[in-house]
């Protein structure tokens, strides 16, 4: 989840596509980690998200609401924070390849 946070930040900074899974958009353990906001997401860099809505740590429905205006979001009911179905990310990789 924190890896996805950094993937979004670095994707924008270096103009690179990204695929994220169950991201933490508002890390709260350090003050110098600002929340991901519209400024971080509103651009033309291809980004895709995979969300398992059963995440027991983060509210993925709220995350989905925040992300779906800016990127393709694939969500599944159930799952958990460590990802029950990581193989589904392979489909997103193939979709991302279509951009290039």
Predicted ranges, named:
Residues 1-7:
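Gly/Ala-rich beta-loop-alpha elbow adjacent to hydrolase catalytic centers
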Residues 10-11:
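Aromatic pocket-lining residues of Rossmann-like dinucleotide-binding sites
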Residues 16-29, 52:
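Active-site nucleophile loop of the alpha/beta-hydrolase fold
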Residues 23-44, 87-90:
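Flexible "cap/lid" loop of the alpha/beta hydrolase fold
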Residues 42-44, 48-55:
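Short beta-strand/loop motif that positions the catalytic acidic residue
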Residues 53-56, 77-80:
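Acidic beta-to-alpha connecting loop that harbors the catalytic carboxylate
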Residues 55-62, 84:
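Conserved alpha/beta-hydrolase "acid-adjacent" motif
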Residues 79-89:
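Catalytic histidine-centered segment of alpha/beta-hydrolase-like enzymes
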């Amino acid at each position: 989840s924190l890896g996805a946070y950094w993937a979004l930040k670095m994707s924008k900074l270096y103009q690179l596509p990204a695929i994220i899974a169950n991201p933490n958009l508002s890390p709260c353990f350090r003050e110098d980690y600002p929340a991901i906001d519209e400024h971080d997401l509103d651009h033309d860099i291809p980004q895709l998200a995979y969300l398992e809505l059963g995440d027991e740590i983060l509210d993925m429905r709220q995350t989905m609401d925040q992300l779906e205006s800016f990127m393709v979001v694939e969500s599944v009911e159930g799952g958990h924070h460590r990802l029950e179905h990581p193989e589904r990310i392979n489909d997103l990789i193939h979709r991302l390849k279509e951009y290039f």
